[in-house]
Design a protein with these regions (language model features):
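N-terminal Rossmann-like NAD(P)+-binding domain of SDR-like oxidoreductases, especially those catalyzing
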Residues: 1-151
Length: 151
């Protein structure tokens, strides 16, 4: 996977999947703009350590950014980066937490995704990948899960 000369935006770049995807793409020759708000739902020290590793790559730029409340900065930074694709991995995790603090989910999952969709439309992004969670399958008993099942 060498010479992957693409410019990729990864939201949630300090999370587990975002970090490993960023690292793999950087090692493959991509330029990566990592975006994360570094929320304290998971260990911020771990997120900072992951981001520090990514910053060792010359082709990595990091933005500590809230996808809901800093939309103008998001739009201008991503537009000037001129990406070939976006991996939208940022989200508020935790099913139990969604019951206790539903506003966080509405804001961080729905509004943030809407902002990424609008940005993608505006700059005519060629490739947009939005990650989800197995939680969307709910109490489904059919295994393995597949994309045809009700969510």
């Amino acid at each position: 996977m060498n010479n992957f000369e693409k410019k990729i935006v990864i939201t949630g770049s300090a999370g587990f999947i975002g970090f490993h995807l960023s690292k793999m793409l950087l090692e493959s020759g991509a330029e990566v703009l990592g975006i994360d708000c570094l929320s304290n739902y998971y260990d911020v020290n771990l997120k900072n350590a992951r981001t520090k590793i990514l910053k060792d790559f010359n082709s990595f730029k990091f933005l500590k950014l809230d996808l809901v409340n800093e939309v103008d900065t998001l739009n201008s930074e991503v537009e000037s980066f001129s990406p070939d694709g976006i991996f939208h991995l940022a989200a508020q995790a935790g099913v139990r937490h969604s019951i206790n603090v539903p506003e966080a989910y509405l804001s961080n999952n729905i509004v943030a995704t809407f902002n990424i969709l609008e940005l993608s439309r505006k700059i005519k992004i060629k490739h947009l990948i939005i990650a989800s969670t197995s939680s969307v399958y709910g109490a489904n008993t059919d295994m393995p899960f597949n994309e045809e099942q009700a969510t």
